[in-house]
From Swiss-Prot:
InterPro entries to which the protein is assigned, alphabetical: RuBisCO, RuBisCo_large_chain_AS, RuBisCO_lsu_C, RuBisCO_lsu_C_sf, RuBisCO_lsu_fd_N, RuBisCO_lsu_N_sf, RuBisCO_lsuI
Compartments where located: Plastid, Chloroplast
Propeptide: 1-2
Alphabetical UniProt keywords: Acetylation, Calvin cycle, Carbon dioxide fixation, Chloroplast, Disulfide bond, Lyase, Magnesium, Metal-binding, Methylation, Monooxygenase, Oxidoreductase, Photorespiration, Photosynthesis, Plastid
N6,N6,N6-trimethyllysine found at: 14
Miscellaneous notes: The basic functional RuBisCO is composed of a large chain homodimer in a 'head-to-tail' conformation. In form I RuBisCO this homodimer is arranged in a barrel-like tetramer with the small subunits forming a tetrameric 'cap' on each end of the 'barrel'.
GO molecular function: magnesium ion binding; monooxygenase activity; ribulose-bisphosphate carboxylase activity
Post-translational modification: The disulfide bond which can form in the large chain dimeric partners within the hexadecamer appears to be associated with oxidative stress and protein turnover.
Pfam families cross-referenced by the UniProt entry: RuBisCO_large, RuBisCO_large_N
Gene: rbcL
PTM annotation (N-acetylproline): residues: 3
Gene3D superfamilies: Ribulose bisphosphate carboxylase, large subunit, C-terminal domain, RuBisCO large subunit, N-terminal domain
Identification of the protein by name: Ribulose bisphosphate carboxylase large chain
Protein backbone atom coordinates (compact mmCIF):
# COMPACT_ATOMS: atom_id res chain seq x y z
CA UNK A 1 0.00 0.00 0.00
CA UNK A 2 1.42 3.40 -0.95
CA UNK A 3 1.88 6.15 1.65
CA UNK A 4 -0.69 8.23 -0.23
CA UNK A 5 -3.33 5.50 0.07
CA UNK A 6 -2.57 5.02 3.74
CA UNK A 7 -3.08 8.72 4.34
CA UNK A 8 -6.46 8.74 2.57
CA UNK A 9 -7.73 5.71 4.45
CA UNK A 10 -6.71 7.12 7.80
CA UNK A 11 -8.18 10.61 7.42
CA UNK A 12 -10.76 11.20 10.17
CA UNK A 13 -10.42 7.68 11.54
CA UNK A 14 -9.69 7.08 15.20
CA UNK A 15 -9.91 3.52 16.43
CA UNK A 16 -11.85 2.72 19.59
CA UNK A 17 -15.35 2.69 21.02
CA UNK A 18 -17.52 5.79 21.35
CA UNK A 19 -21.04 6.42 22.60
CA UNK A 20 -23.75 5.73 20.03
CA UNK A 21 -25.52 8.97 20.90
CA UNK A 22 -22.64 11.03 19.54
CA UNK A 23 -23.50 9.83 16.03
CA UNK A 24 -27.02 8.39 16.07
CA UNK A 25 -29.00 10.59 18.50
CA UNK A 26 -30.13 13.60 16.46
CA UNK A 27 -33.11 15.34 18.13
CA UNK A 28 -32.83 18.22 15.69
CA UNK A 29 -33.47 15.94 12.68
CA UNK A 30 -36.54 16.73 10.57
CA UNK A 31 -38.00 13.54 9.16
CA UNK A 32 -38.46 13.15 5.41
CA UNK A 33 -41.51 11.89 3.58
CA UNK A 34 -39.36 9.04 2.25
CA UNK A 35 -38.09 7.87 5.68
CA UNK A 36 -39.36 4.69 7.29
CA UNK A 37 -40.26 5.78 10.83
CA UNK A 38 -40.27 3.39 13.78
CA UNK A 39 -41.57 3.71 17.34
CA UNK A 40 -39.69 1.40 19.73
CA UNK A 41 -40.56 0.76 23.37
CA UNK A 42 -37.10 0.72 24.95
CA UNK A 43 -36.20 -0.59 28.41
CA UNK A 44 -32.52 0.28 29.00
CA UNK A 45 -30.26 -1.62 31.35
CA UNK A 46 -29.60 0.18 34.67
CA UNK A 47 -27.14 3.00 34.12
CA UNK A 48 -27.79 3.32 30.38
CA UNK A 49 -29.28 6.75 29.54
CA UNK A 50 -32.41 6.63 27.37
CA UNK A 51 -30.72 8.73 24.68
CA UNK A 52 -27.87 6.23 24.46
CA UNK A 53 -30.36 3.33 24.33
CA UNK A 54 -32.38 4.96 21.55
CA UNK A 55 -29.22 5.78 19.61
CA UNK A 56 -28.02 2.19 20.03
CA UNK A 57 -31.26 0.94 18.48
CA UNK A 58 -30.85 3.31 15.54
CA UNK A 59 -27.22 2.30 15.07
CA UNK A 60 -27.52 -1.46 15.40
CA UNK A 61 -30.56 -1.60 13.09
CA UNK A 62 -28.83 0.44 10.38
CA UNK A 63 -25.14 1.21 9.78
CA UNK A 64 -23.56 0.94 13.23
CA UNK A 65 -21.51 -1.68 14.99
CA UNK A 66 -19.90 -1.89 18.42
CA UNK A 67 -16.68 -0.10 17.51
CA UNK A 68 -15.44 2.50 15.06
CA UNK A 69 -14.30 0.96 11.78
CA UNK A 70 -12.06 2.56 9.16
CA UNK A 71 -14.43 1.62 6.31
CA UNK A 72 -16.88 4.22 7.69
CA UNK A 73 -14.72 6.65 5.75
CA UNK A 74 -15.54 4.96 2.46
CA UNK A 75 -19.24 5.87 2.54
CA UNK A 76 -21.52 8.65 3.75
CA UNK A 77 -22.90 7.71 7.15
CA UNK A 78 -25.01 10.87 7.20
CA UNK A 79 -26.85 9.57 4.15
CA UNK A 80 -27.38 5.98 5.29
CA UNK A 81 -27.52 5.91 9.09
CA UNK A 82 -30.67 5.47 11.14
CA UNK A 83 -31.36 8.38 13.48
CA UNK A 84 -33.03 8.43 16.87
CA UNK A 85 -34.85 11.75 16.61
CA UNK A 86 -37.03 11.62 19.70
CA UNK A 87 -37.36 10.03 23.15
CA UNK A 88 -40.39 10.16 25.42
CA UNK A 89 -41.11 8.32 28.69
CA UNK A 90 -43.94 5.77 28.76
CA UNK A 91 -46.64 6.97 31.14
CA UNK A 92 -47.09 4.71 34.15
CA UNK A 93 -44.03 2.57 33.40
CA UNK A 94 -40.69 2.85 35.17
CA UNK A 95 -37.61 3.05 32.96
CA UNK A 96 -39.50 2.58 29.69
CA UNK A 97 -39.28 5.01 26.80
CA UNK A 98 -40.62 5.37 23.28
CA UNK A 99 -37.67 5.94 20.96
CA UNK A 100 -38.48 7.29 17.51
CA UNK A 101 -36.08 6.23 14.77
CA UNK A 102 -35.94 7.36 11.13
CA UNK A 103 -34.39 5.14 8.46
CA UNK A 104 -33.37 6.40 5.00
CA UNK A 105 -35.24 4.56 2.28
CA UNK A 106 -32.02 3.54 0.52
CA UNK A 107 -31.33 1.06 3.34
CA UNK A 108 -34.08 -1.27 2.10
CA UNK A 109 -34.59 -3.50 -0.92
CA UNK A 110 -37.66 -2.66 -2.95
CA UNK A 111 -40.65 -4.95 -2.44
CA UNK A 112 -39.01 -7.01 0.33
CA UNK A 113 -40.64 -7.27 3.75
CA UNK A 114 -37.94 -9.82 4.53
CA UNK A 115 -35.17 -7.27 4.04
CA UNK A 116 -37.04 -4.55 5.93
CA UNK A 117 -37.51 -6.73 9.00
CA UNK A 118 -33.99 -8.14 8.85
CA UNK A 119 -32.72 -4.61 9.46
CA UNK A 120 -35.33 -3.12 11.77
CA UNK A 121 -36.03 -6.16 13.99
CA UNK A 122 -32.79 -8.05 13.53
CA UNK A 123 -29.81 -8.40 15.87
CA UNK A 124 -30.69 -5.25 17.78
CA UNK A 125 -33.31 -7.19 19.78
CA UNK A 126 -30.54 -9.17 21.46
CA UNK A 127 -28.47 -6.11 22.34
CA UNK A 128 -27.08 -6.35 25.88
CA UNK A 129 -27.46 -2.64 26.66
CA UNK A 130 -31.24 -3.13 26.51
CA UNK A 131 -33.28 -5.10 29.01
CA UNK A 132 -36.14 -5.27 26.52
CA UNK A 133 -37.17 -3.81 23.17
CA UNK A 134 -40.52 -3.77 21.39
CA UNK A 135 -41.38 -2.37 17.98
CA UNK A 136 -44.73 -0.64 18.51
CA UNK A 137 -45.38 0.82 15.06
CA UNK A 138 -43.90 1.66 11.66
CA UNK A 139 -44.68 4.46 9.23
CA UNK A 140 -44.14 3.06 5.75
CA UNK A 141 -43.53 5.88 3.24
CA UNK A 142 -45.65 5.94 0.11
CA UNK A 143 -42.53 5.66 -2.04
CA UNK A 144 -41.76 2.27 -0.46
CA UNK A 145 -45.37 1.05 -0.49
CA UNK A 146 -45.43 1.57 -4.25
CA UNK A 147 -42.77 -1.14 -4.62
CA UNK A 148 -45.18 -3.78 -3.24
CA UNK A 149 -48.05 -5.57 -4.98
CA UNK A 150 -49.89 -6.03 -1.68
CA UNK A 151 -53.00 -8.24 -1.38
CA UNK A 152 -53.67 -10.40 -4.44
CA UNK A 153 -57.15 -8.92 -4.91
CA UNK A 154 -58.45 -6.86 -1.97
CA UNK A 155 -61.86 -6.36 -0.42
CA UNK A 156 -63.90 -5.04 -3.35
CA UNK A 157 -62.60 -7.56 -5.87
CA UNK A 158 -63.32 -10.40 -3.42
CA UNK A 159 -66.89 -9.24 -2.95
CA UNK A 160 -67.33 -9.04 -6.71
CA UNK A 161 -65.92 -12.56 -7.13
CA UNK A 162 -68.28 -13.92 -4.47
CA UNK A 163 -71.25 -11.68 -5.40
CA UNK A 164 -71.85 -11.03 -1.69
CA UNK A 165 -72.43 -7.53 -0.36
CA UNK A 166 -73.78 -5.67 2.65
CA UNK A 167 -72.81 -8.11 5.40
CA UNK A 168 -69.79 -9.80 6.98
CA UNK A 169 -68.76 -13.11 5.44
CA UNK A 170 -69.24 -16.28 7.50
CA UNK A 171 -66.64 -19.00 7.96
CA UNK A 172 -65.88 -22.10 9.99
CA UNK A 173 -62.67 -23.90 10.90
CA UNK A 174 -63.15 -27.65 10.56
CA UNK A 175 -62.67 -29.48 13.87
CA UNK A 176 -61.09 -31.58 15.17
CA UNK A 177 -58.22 -29.81 13.48
CA UNK A 178 -56.17 -33.02 13.25
CA UNK A 179 -57.12 -36.69 12.90
CA UNK A 180 -59.99 -36.76 10.40
CA UNK A 181 -59.72 -38.74 7.18
CA UNK A 182 -59.95 -36.74 3.96
CA UNK A 183 -63.42 -38.07 3.15
CA UNK A 184 -64.88 -37.28 6.57
CA UNK A 185 -63.19 -33.90 6.45
CA UNK A 186 -64.82 -33.16 3.09
CA UNK A 187 -68.17 -34.27 4.47
CA UNK A 188 -67.91 -31.72 7.29
CA UNK A 189 -66.99 -29.02 4.76
CA UNK A 190 -70.05 -29.85 2.65
CA UNK A 191 -72.44 -29.81 5.61
CA UNK A 192 -71.21 -26.41 6.81
CA UNK A 193 -71.34 -24.81 3.36
CA UNK A 194 -74.76 -26.29 2.61
CA UNK A 195 -76.04 -24.87 5.90
CA UNK A 196 -75.30 -21.29 4.89
CA UNK A 197 -71.64 -20.48 5.50
CA UNK A 198 -69.58 -18.73 2.83
CA UNK A 199 -66.29 -20.41 3.69
CA UNK A 200 -64.83 -23.31 5.61
CA UNK A 201 -61.19 -23.50 6.58
CA UNK A 202 -58.23 -25.77 7.15
CA UNK A 203 -56.73 -25.11 10.55
CA UNK A 204 -53.23 -23.68 10.63
CA UNK A 205 -51.48 -27.00 11.30
CA UNK A 206 -53.40 -29.01 8.70
CA UNK A 207 -50.75 -29.53 6.02
CA UNK A 208 -50.06 -33.09 4.77
CA UNK A 209 -49.96 -35.60 7.62
CA UNK A 210 -50.20 -39.41 7.53
CA UNK A 211 -53.90 -39.44 8.42
CA UNK A 212 -54.81 -36.98 5.63
CA UNK A 213 -52.50 -36.15 2.73
CA UNK A 214 -52.96 -32.76 1.14
CA UNK A 215 -54.00 -33.98 -2.31
CA UNK A 216 -56.77 -36.18 -0.89
CA UNK A 217 -58.03 -33.30 1.23
CA UNK A 218 -58.04 -30.90 -1.70
CA UNK A 219 -60.04 -33.35 -3.83
CA UNK A 220 -62.74 -34.05 -1.23
CA UNK A 221 -63.01 -30.35 -0.31
CA UNK A 222 -63.41 -29.39 -3.97
CA UNK A 223 -66.24 -31.93 -4.27
CA UNK A 224 -67.88 -30.39 -1.18
CA UNK A 225 -67.55 -26.87 -2.60
CA UNK A 226 -69.16 -27.68 -5.94
CA UNK A 227 -71.94 -29.81 -4.45
CA UNK A 228 -72.90 -27.12 -1.92
CA UNK A 229 -72.78 -24.42 -4.62
CA UNK A 230 -75.14 -26.44 -6.81
CA UNK A 231 -77.60 -26.89 -3.94
CA UNK A 232 -77.57 -23.34 -2.56
CA UNK A 233 -76.96 -21.19 -5.63
CA UNK A 234 -74.27 -19.29 -3.68
CA UNK A 235 -70.53 -19.15 -4.33
CA UNK A 236 -68.66 -21.13 -1.69
CA UNK A 237 -65.03 -21.67 -0.76
CA UNK A 238 -62.71 -23.62 1.49
CA UNK A 239 -59.34 -22.26 2.58
CA UNK A 240 -57.00 -24.95 1.28
CA UNK A 241 -53.83 -24.63 3.33
CA UNK A 242 -50.91 -24.63 0.91
CA UNK A 243 -48.27 -24.12 3.63
CA UNK A 244 -45.48 -26.66 3.21
CA UNK A 245 -41.89 -27.43 4.11
CA UNK A 246 -40.48 -25.84 0.95
CA UNK A 247 -41.59 -23.01 -1.34
CA UNK A 248 -41.62 -25.44 -4.26
CA UNK A 249 -44.04 -27.76 -2.48
CA UNK A 250 -46.21 -24.81 -1.41
CA UNK A 251 -46.50 -23.63 -5.01
CA UNK A 252 -47.32 -27.17 -6.19
CA UNK A 253 -50.27 -27.24 -3.79
CA UNK A 254 -51.49 -23.81 -4.87
CA UNK A 255 -51.29 -24.83 -8.53
CA UNK A 256 -53.32 -27.98 -7.83
CA UNK A 257 -55.95 -25.91 -6.00
CA UNK A 258 -56.26 -23.64 -9.03
CA UNK A 259 -56.56 -26.64 -11.36
CA UNK A 260 -59.42 -27.97 -9.24
CA UNK A 261 -61.24 -24.64 -9.60
CA UNK A 262 -60.95 -23.72 -5.92
CA UNK A 263 -61.49 -19.98 -5.28
CA UNK A 264 -59.11 -19.56 -2.34
CA UNK A 265 -55.96 -20.97 -0.73
CA UNK A 266 -54.36 -20.35 2.63
CA UNK A 267 -50.91 -19.71 4.07
CA UNK A 268 -49.40 -19.53 7.58
CA UNK A 269 -47.39 -16.40 6.87
CA UNK A 270 -45.23 -16.22 9.99
CA UNK A 271 -44.20 -19.86 10.18
CA UNK A 272 -43.96 -20.03 6.38
CA UNK A 273 -42.01 -16.78 6.13
CA UNK A 274 -42.45 -13.51 4.27
CA UNK A 275 -40.49 -14.58 1.20
CA UNK A 276 -42.75 -17.60 0.70
CA UNK A 277 -45.84 -15.52 1.43
CA UNK A 278 -44.99 -12.82 -1.10
CA UNK A 279 -44.26 -15.46 -3.75
CA UNK A 280 -47.63 -17.11 -3.09
CA UNK A 281 -49.45 -13.75 -3.15
CA UNK A 282 -47.97 -12.97 -6.57
CA UNK A 283 -49.10 -16.36 -7.87
CA UNK A 284 -52.61 -15.85 -6.46
CA UNK A 285 -53.02 -12.50 -8.19
CA UNK A 286 -51.79 -13.85 -11.50
CA UNK A 287 -54.11 -16.87 -11.30
CA UNK A 288 -57.30 -15.50 -9.76
CA UNK A 289 -56.98 -17.16 -6.35
CA UNK A 290 -57.93 -15.41 -3.12
CA UNK A 291 -55.40 -15.79 -0.30
CA UNK A 292 -56.37 -16.37 3.33
CA UNK A 293 -53.63 -15.73 5.90
CA UNK A 294 -53.31 -17.36 9.30
CA UNK A 295 -51.09 -15.70 11.90
CA UNK A 296 -49.90 -18.81 13.76
CA UNK A 297 -46.87 -17.93 15.94
CA UNK A 298 -47.85 -14.26 16.27
CA UNK A 299 -48.28 -14.40 20.05
CA UNK A 300 -44.69 -15.58 20.46
CA UNK A 301 -43.70 -12.27 18.86
CA UNK A 302 -46.36 -9.81 20.00
CA UNK A 303 -47.89 -10.84 23.32
CA UNK A 304 -45.27 -9.50 25.74
CA UNK A 305 -45.88 -5.82 26.37
CA UNK A 306 -42.24 -4.76 26.64
CA UNK A 307 -40.43 -7.01 24.16
CA UNK A 308 -41.02 -8.21 20.62
CA UNK A 309 -43.22 -6.58 18.03
CA UNK A 310 -46.81 -5.37 18.16
CA UNK A 311 -49.29 -7.12 15.90
CA UNK A 312 -50.12 -3.83 14.18
CA UNK A 313 -46.62 -4.01 12.65
CA UNK A 314 -47.17 -7.61 11.55
CA UNK A 315 -50.52 -6.54 10.07
CA UNK A 316 -48.90 -3.75 8.06
CA UNK A 317 -46.22 -6.14 6.87
CA UNK A 318 -48.87 -8.62 5.75
CA UNK A 319 -50.71 -5.96 3.76
CA UNK A 320 -47.42 -5.22 1.98
CA UNK A 321 -46.44 -8.87 1.48
CA UNK A 322 -49.91 -9.89 0.35
CA UNK A 323 -53.05 -11.55 1.71
CA UNK A 324 -56.79 -11.03 1.25
CA UNK A 325 -57.78 -12.13 4.78
CA UNK A 326 -55.87 -12.24 8.06
CA UNK A 327 -56.86 -13.33 11.54
CA UNK A 328 -57.11 -10.27 13.75
CA UNK A 329 -58.55 -11.38 17.10
CA UNK A 330 -62.17 -11.16 18.21
CA UNK A 331 -62.29 -8.77 21.21
CA UNK A 332 -65.07 -11.00 22.63
CA UNK A 333 -63.77 -14.56 22.12
CA UNK A 334 -61.10 -16.80 23.65
CA UNK A 335 -58.04 -15.10 22.11
CA UNK A 336 -56.20 -11.93 23.08
CA UNK A 337 -57.52 -8.61 21.72
CA UNK A 338 -58.44 -5.34 23.46
CA UNK A 339 -61.15 -3.42 21.59
CA UNK A 340 -59.57 -0.06 20.71
CA UNK A 341 -56.17 -1.55 19.93
CA UNK A 342 -57.76 -4.26 17.78
CA UNK A 343 -59.84 -1.70 15.87
CA UNK A 344 -56.67 0.34 15.36
CA UNK A 345 -54.93 -2.37 13.39
CA UNK A 346 -58.19 -3.45 11.73
CA UNK A 347 -58.35 0.05 10.23
CA UNK A 348 -54.70 -0.27 9.17
CA UNK A 349 -55.66 -3.44 7.31
CA UNK A 350 -58.77 -2.10 5.57
CA UNK A 351 -58.56 1.66 5.13
CA UNK A 352 -56.60 3.65 2.57
CA UNK A 353 -55.59 6.42 4.99
CA UNK A 354 -55.31 6.13 8.78
CA UNK A 355 -54.58 9.11 11.03
CA UNK A 356 -52.23 8.98 13.99
CA UNK A 357 -54.23 8.09 17.11
CA UNK A 358 -52.28 7.20 20.23
CA UNK A 359 -55.48 6.21 22.06
CA UNK A 360 -55.64 3.23 19.67
CA UNK A 361 -51.90 2.60 19.60
CA UNK A 362 -51.37 4.21 16.18
CA UNK A 363 -48.12 6.19 16.42
CA UNK A 364 -47.97 7.47 12.83
CA UNK A 365 -50.34 8.59 10.10
CA UNK A 366 -50.29 5.93 7.38
CA UNK A 367 -51.16 6.53 3.72
CA UNK A 368 -51.55 3.28 1.78
CA UNK A 369 -51.85 5.04 -1.60
CA UNK A 370 -54.64 2.72 -2.78
CA UNK A 371 -52.88 -0.55 -1.92
CA UNK A 372 -55.77 -3.06 -1.73
CA UNK A 373 -57.24 -3.68 1.72
CA UNK A 374 -57.32 -6.89 3.77
CA UNK A 375 -60.42 -8.41 5.38
CA UNK A 376 -59.90 -8.95 9.13
CA UNK A 377 -60.99 -12.37 10.35
CA UNK A 378 -62.57 -12.72 13.80
CA UNK A 379 -62.03 -16.28 14.95
CA UNK A 380 -61.56 -18.11 18.24
CA UNK A 381 -64.14 -19.03 20.88
CA UNK A 382 -67.09 -17.20 19.34
CA UNK A 383 -70.72 -18.35 19.06
CA UNK A 384 -74.18 -17.02 18.19
CA UNK A 385 -74.50 -14.84 21.31
CA UNK A 386 -71.40 -12.95 20.14
CA UNK A 387 -72.89 -12.17 16.72
CA UNK A 388 -74.35 -8.73 17.58
CA UNK A 389 -71.09 -7.56 19.16
CA UNK A 390 -68.99 -8.92 16.29
CA UNK A 391 -71.22 -7.28 13.68
CA UNK A 392 -71.07 -3.98 15.55
CA UNK A 393 -67.30 -4.09 16.19
CA UNK A 394 -66.02 -5.32 12.83
CA UNK A 395 -68.70 -4.08 10.43
CA UNK A 396 -69.46 -5.52 7.01
CA UNK A 397 -65.91 -5.81 5.70
CA UNK A 398 -64.86 -8.76 7.83
CA UNK A 399 -65.01 -12.53 8.08
CA UNK A 400 -66.65 -13.99 11.19
CA UNK A 401 -65.39 -17.51 11.70
CA UNK A 402 -67.13 -20.00 13.99
CA UNK A 403 -65.37 -23.35 14.40
CA UNK A 404 -66.67 -24.91 17.60
CA UNK A 405 -69.55 -22.42 17.32
CA UNK A 406 -70.71 -24.29 14.20
CA UNK A 407 -69.52 -27.87 14.64
CA UNK A 408 -70.51 -27.95 18.31
CA UNK A 409 -74.22 -27.52 17.56
CA UNK A 410 -76.20 -30.32 19.25
CA UNK A 411 -77.99 -31.21 15.99
CA UNK A 412 -74.90 -31.36 13.77
CA UNK A 413 -72.82 -29.31 11.40
CA UNK A 414 -75.44 -28.09 8.94
CA UNK A 415 -77.83 -26.88 11.69
CA UNK A 416 -74.85 -25.14 13.31
CA UNK A 417 -74.22 -23.29 10.06
CA UNK A 418 -77.92 -22.43 9.76
CA UNK A 419 -77.89 -20.99 13.29
CA UNK A 420 -74.94 -18.74 12.52
CA UNK A 421 -76.38 -17.55 9.20
CA UNK A 422 -79.75 -16.76 10.78
CA UNK A 423 -78.07 -14.89 13.65
CA UNK A 424 -75.96 -12.86 11.22
CA UNK A 425 -78.87 -11.98 8.93
CA UNK A 426 -80.94 -10.94 11.97
CA UNK A 427 -78.16 -8.67 13.25
CA UNK A 428 -77.58 -7.06 9.84
CA UNK A 429 -81.31 -6.45 9.37
CA UNK A 430 -81.64 -5.00 12.88
CA UNK A 431 -78.66 -2.70 12.30
CA UNK A 432 -80.06 -1.55 8.97
CA UNK A 433 -83.35 -0.75 10.70
CA UNK A 434 -81.49 1.51 13.13
CA UNK A 435 -81.42 -0.73 16.19
CA UNK A 436 -78.47 -0.58 18.60
CA UNK A 437 -76.61 -3.89 18.38
CA UNK A 438 -74.49 -3.17 21.45
CA UNK A 439 -77.53 -2.51 23.65
CA UNK A 440 -80.20 -4.72 22.07
CA UNK A 441 -78.03 -7.58 20.83
CA UNK A 442 -79.33 -10.32 23.09
CA UNK A 443 -82.92 -9.36 22.39
CA UNK A 444 -82.30 -9.43 18.63
CA UNK A 445 -80.91 -12.97 18.89
CA UNK A 446 -83.80 -14.10 21.10
CA UNK A 447 -86.35 -12.72 18.63
CA UNK A 448 -84.69 -14.52 15.72
CA UNK A 449 -84.51 -17.79 17.66
CA UNK A 450 -88.32 -17.86 17.92
CA UNK A 451 -88.62 -18.74 14.23
CA UNK A 452 -85.35 -20.66 13.86
CA UNK A 453 -85.18 -23.87 15.89
CA UNK A 454 -81.51 -24.28 14.89
CA UNK A 455 -80.66 -20.90 16.40
CA UNK A 456 -82.77 -21.61 19.49
CA UNK A 457 -80.81 -24.82 20.12
CA UNK A 458 -77.50 -23.00 19.67
CA UNK A 459 -78.58 -20.25 22.06
CA UNK A 460 -79.40 -22.81 24.71
CA UNK A 461 -76.07 -24.65 24.38
CA UNK A 462 -73.83 -21.57 24.58
CA UNK A 463 -75.81 -19.28 26.87
CA UNK A 464 -73.30 -19.66 29.73
CA UNK A 465 -70.04 -19.67 27.73
CA UNK A 466 -67.78 -16.67 28.36
CA UNK A 467 -64.05 -15.96 28.16
CA UNK A 468 -63.54 -13.19 30.69
CA UNK A 469 -59.83 -12.65 31.21
CA UNK A 470 -57.94 -9.39 31.40
CA UNK A 471 -56.26 -8.41 28.12
CA UNK A 472 -52.45 -8.34 28.18
CA UNK A 473 -52.18 -5.96 25.22
CA UNK A 474 -53.10 -2.57 26.68
CA UNK A 475 -51.80 0.93 26.04
Amino acid sequence: MSPQTETKASVGFKAGVKDYKLTYYTPEYETKDTDILAAFRVTPQPGVPPEEAGAAVAAESSTGTWTTVWTDGLTSLDRYKGRCYGIEPVAGEENQYIAYVAYPLDLFEEGSVTNMFTSIVGNVFGFKALRALRLEDLRIPTAYIKTFQGPPHGIQVERDKLNKYGRPLLGCTIKPKLGLSAKNYGRAVYECLRGGLDFTKDDENVNSQPFMRWRDRFLFCAEAIFKSQAETGEIKGHYLNATAGTCEEMMKRAIFARELGAPIVMHDYLTGGFTANTSLAHYCRDNGLLLHIHRAMHAVIDRQKNHGMHFRVLAKALRMSGGDHIHAGTVVGKLEGEREITLGFVDLLRDDFVEKDRSRGIYFTQDWVSLPGVLPVASGGIHVWHMPALTEIFGDDSVLQFGGGTLGHPWGNAPGAVANRVALEACVQARNEGRDLAREGNEIIREASKWSPELAAACEVWKEIKFEFEAMDTL
